[in-house]
Amino acid sequence: MDFTLSADDRLLQQSVRDFIEQQGNSGWQEIERTDTLPKALIEGARDVGLLGLSIPQEYGGLGLSVVQKTLCHEMLGRGPWGLASFISVHTGIGCVGIVRFGNAAQKQRYLPKMATGEWIGSFALTEPQSGSDAAGLQTRAERKGDGYVLNGHKTFITNAPRAHHFVTFARTSAGISAFIVDADSPGVSIGQVFNTTGHRGSQISEVVFEDARIPAEALIGEEGKGMDYAKRCLSEGRTTLSARCVGTGQKALELAVEYAEQRKTFGKPLIEHQALAFRLAQMSARTEAARLVVYRSAWILDQGGQAIRESSTAKYLAAEGAWQTVDDALQIFGGYGYIQGEYMIDRLWRDLRVARVYDGSSEVQQIVIAGRLRKGDVETAWG
């Protein structure tokens, strides 16, 4: 078993890390203050190729494997999560459905402009009464004439205020179906824009469909297959989100070690106090363990597997582990860690907290894992 990255993958990883450290983390206080991603930062992400991670090369993207995308997302986790979420939704769950299940006309219309950032994508699944229970969604799409009429209400939709279109899920006569809904379609509007504790700049809001008319060609794949498509998008999305958690945990660990080497108490550096040294060791162990599980999930997806249990395991371990690691880092910084905008730890703490909630809460991940075990998905097949 060889864990060595290829030269190309190391270059990819380093280019994203350099972008995050030089552009993302250098201006994070401004993002926190304005709750806006600077245009130059989005353009920088485009120039590195981050807006086209999932888009095939023939449409102007990078066409990366899931493992390669996971490398990128781990590096994104080192920076502001508002930027990471913007990129993740645009080129991840807001894009993968079109890439994998869209027809040739849909790909030709949307993907080239998504790769350049001219059009920003979003993913509209969550509703006020159906978050983790996505299959309980109430938005309906009624077939009328040569198209559909949508009625419903989506919430917590990342990128919605800036989106050109939404990969949207609604009930049809055949079951839950997926559609590409342009934001300027008649009857589509943006509702409340949320003021979030972390993820500053990501723009999260409600999306309202009131007799919204869309053409028949907006349907992705077949009617009634929407949840199958959503699950595939979410398995990959949970894997790359888990990678961001690992990246955040790694960044917190590095900051904590640096601080513990410099800060002195009782005549010696913090890191020489055994209690603090053990805490740092635990932070490192959690991060390394989660990283292995995350990349295992990514590898399974690249082999054509569904990775349902594996992606949920990665999400659960990475989110919970990174949260504990970031909280431990804040504890090491003491009072300075709780001062907003001082040492970056407070931003990591606020950004990371929601990872235990969205894309399926930690409780839901345990339900998914247990459900797979009941179905006989017990063995860890390395072959």
State what each model feature region is:
Residues 49, 72-77, 170-173, 181-186, ...:
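Short Ser/Thr-interspersed hydrophobic loop/turn segments at strand-loop and sheet-helix junctions
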Residues 117-125:
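A short, Trp-centered hydrophobic/proline-enriched beta-strand micro-motif
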Residues 136, 184-215:
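Flexible, small-/acidic-enriched active-site or ligand-binding loops
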Residues 147, 151-193:
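A short core secondary-structure module
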Residues 210-229:
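Long, acidic (Asp/Glu-rich), low-complexity accessory segments flanking structured domains
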Residues 1-83, 89, 101-106, 113-118, ...:
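Alpha-helical interface subdomain recognition
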Residues 114, 129-132, 156-159, 171, ...:
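Short Gly/Pro-enriched turn/cap motifs at secondary-structure boundaries
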Residues 64-65, 133-135, 159-163, 200-202, ...:
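Short glycine/proline-enriched turns and hinge-like loops at secondary-structure junctions
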